[in-house]
C-alpha cells in the first residue's frame, strides 16, 4: 500500500473513531454538538460517510506535508489536526453562534481533534 493511500485510510479510520466516541465526549464535556450529525444534516449514517471522506482528504494532506518536513509523523499529525481546529474554530459560529463562546464546546472540539491526530499519526 502506498504511503498516500495508507494516510488516506488512516485519516478515514480516525474520523470514524471520532464519530463513534462522540456520544461519550458529549456526556463528558456537557456539550451535545455532533460533527457527524451536522455533516449528515441529522442523519448519522450520512454524516459518518462525509466525515470519513473528510478524514481521508486530511490524511492525504498530512501525507503531502510529511513528505516535505523532517519531523516525527505522530507529532506532525497531532499538530496539523490541532492547527486545523484552531484555524477553523471561529467559523463554528456559522453553525451555532453559542458554540463559539462556549469553553465546553471548545474543549470538546480540541479533544476530538487531538484524538483524530493521535490515531492518524499512529496509523499513517
Per-segment meaning from a language model:
Residues 1-124:
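Short amphipathic, positively biased membrane-proximal segments
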